[in-house]
Amino acid sequence: MDLYMIVLLSLCGLLRAQETTDTISLDNCCEDGKKRGLESQDCSSLPLISESTTCRVVQEQCCSAVLEDSICTSGINMAKDQSSCDALLSGSSTCETKTTKMCCECCLLGSSRCRIRVSPVSSVCRWSISRGPGVRSCCVDKQPAHGVQPSKGDAQNTEDQCRAAGCAQRCLNGTCSCLDGFKLKTDGKHCEDINECLLGPHHCVTGERCINTLGSYRCQREISCGTGYELTDNNKCKDIDECDLGTHNCAAEMECQNTAGSFRCRPRMQCAAGFIQDALGSCIDINECVSVTALSRGQMCFNTVGSFICQRHSVTCGRGYHLNAEGTRCVDIDECAGPDNSCDGHGCINLVGSYRCECRTGFIFNSISRSCEDIDECRNYPGRLCAHKCENILGSYKCSCTAGFKLADDGRNCDDVNECESSPCSQGCANVYGSYQSYCRRGYQLSDADGITCEDIDECALPTGGHICSYRCHNTPGSFHCTCPASGYTLAANGRSCQDIDECLTGTHSCSESESCFNIQGGFRCLSFDCPANYRRSGDTRPRVDRADIIRCVKSCQHNDISCVLNPILSHSHTAISLPTFREFNKPEEIVFLRSPTPTHLPHMDSPEIVYDILEGNIQNSFDIIKRLDHGMIVGVVKQVRPLVGPVRTVLKLAMNYVTNGVVSHRNIINVRIYVSEFWF
């Protein structure tokens, strides 16, 4: 059964259930869908030719059927032309490509059934066979017409020609051709995509941009639809119905009306007579008295809710007048008549419609309140009446002085008071203009409580007290004094710093004659430097060792001692340093410098490279060694990179390696005895 008839019959139930007055038949709907499918239009967004939902479904199904037949026919033609589906758009995974390949492979199965008479393949290619007689014809076309059997040699010859041609897509009698949307390359075998956008055979209209695809193209809109519109699947702009979607902002008493690209809010109700509608749709009263002009003489307009009324005008007298006895006119009021007049004890003068008060000294008449008011002399004449403070009183003013002054005999100026005559301060007093200042002797400060009592300054407790004395600070009344550790230090001449006692220099050490005295901060150490076997001491034996002294043991081999000669260590050096416990360790401290001249560049050998290393004694990884060049010298710099809190003792074993071509030719060992004091000074 034809696919289009299947579509029409499957929709019969829907037709019976749907009442419509549409005059367009389902055949017309299907024919329109088939036409648009032949034009390769998008079947999911076809222009409607009827308001009927059934017609729209028939359009889409008939359009899809035409597209599917076209896609399947391409696969069947490839199978017939090339007897192979391998070259079908290799690597593509689109739905169209999969359908084309499936129909191609099912056609090959149908052809094989005819040649080798295998079991029917209808169960395997059921969907492809339902596409029409195309797949079934793959077997039928192989049968000879009118009962004449084709020559086996002719069929074999055609198949051999296509196999030898090596066509990429289609082959007919050894001649290659391409699918729709492709063209044959100059080699006559392979196919390349046709760029419809570049060559011009596309259907994109003005405002759409053509985008080339493999074997086809698509049209994309270039300009957005703008506010109030949305882009549909068929690349068209459609008005957004804000009223239907509920995206409008109309108030509850307003009704939303959709317009092209926008919407309007219209009032739901009409206002009664005497009312007008505001911007929010509410009915508000009209004040008719603002616009009414046809009033009779002697009448007044009074606005009411939704209307207005007219009343006869009555006689009203202004301020300072009252109605006469007849009630026909206004006459003056004598405000000064009687003992209780309006001037409240001041002189009163009656005027027509008013009055005026004759005020006493220190008062002024207020024409608005019609009364005598006190004159504030202090505010009217600031700084001109009193030297310090001015206080207004009823009808006059008086002067006063600030603290530290007393009023002069003239009642306006102020004289300074000498407060020091009463000895208010505990130590010293200095009179100043209008006050006094207490001061204290050195080592004392004024109390924050009263500002006159002198209190002892605890210099040791001040924020900088930790820096006043090197070791310990002891407060005394009005002063302080510093002390140093019980041994190893003495107080300097400034009375604050602690100086180390050099026991080695003063001879107060206890080292034997075979030992060397080394002074450290706060003490001394007796050091004994012994050279290892096959090494001898270089230089004289010293009774004391300074920081810069280095005791060296150089290699001295016995005759024919091969192991000694081959030993790469040329020397063992000893030195000692004393370090404080750094109070503020903010950056690495350079403590030891190992200097060596730059190796001489000999013409017959490579110059060795000096490499420094820490072998032992690097407690807590507190030390590091780097190499740098300084004035033609290679310097190994030992740095303290982490703080150490004394007392700490360690022996830092350093190696100075001479490396030539990656091999250590010889090395020098340096033993540095490090003593870290528990104090920072």
Swiss-Prot record:
Bridged cysteine pairs (disulfide): 29-55, 30-62, 43-63, 72-103, 85-104, 106-125, 107-138, 114-139, 162-171, 167-176, 178-191, 197-210, 204-219, 225-237, 243-256, 250-265, 271-283, 289-301, 317-330, 336-348, 343-357, 359-372, 378-390, 386-399, 401-414, 420-429, 440-454, 460-473, 469-482, 484-498, 504-517, 511-526, 531-553
Residues bearing glycans: 173
Compartment(s) where it occurs, according to its Swiss-Prot or TrEMBL record: Secreted, Extracellular space, Extracellular matrix
Predominant subcellular localization, coarse grouping: secreted
Protein function: Incorporated into fibronectin-containing matrix fibers. May play a role in cell adhesion and migration along protein fibers within the extracellular matrix (ECM). Could be important for certain developmental processes and contribute to the supramolecular organization of ECM architecture, in particular to those of basement membranes.
Signal peptide start-end: 1-17
InterPro entries linked to this entry: Anaphylatoxin/fibulin (IPR000020), cEGF (IPR026823), EGF-like_Ca-bd_dom (IPR001881), EGF-like_dom (IPR000742), EGF-type_Asp/Asn_hydroxyl_site (IPR000152), EGF_Ca-bd_CS (IPR018097), Fibulin-1 (IPR017048), Fibulin_C (IPR055088)
Gene name linked to the record: fbln1
Name the record gives this protein: Fibulin-1
PANTHER family listed in its UniProt record: EGF-LIKE DOMAIN-CONTAINING PROTEIN, FIBRILLIN-RELATED
The protein's assembly and partners: Homomultimerizes and interacts with various extracellular matrix components such as FN1, LAMA1, NID, AGC1 and CSPG2.
Keywords, comma-separated and alphabetical: Calcium, Disulfide bond, EGF-like domain, Extracellular matrix, Glycoprotein, Repeat, Secreted, Signal
Organism: Danio rerio (Zebrafish)
Gene Ontology, cellular component aspect: extracellular region
One of the GO BP terms on file: skin morphogenesis
Positions of the Anaphylatoxin-like domain: 29-63, 68-107, 108-139
Listed GO MF terms: calcium ion binding; peptidase activator activity
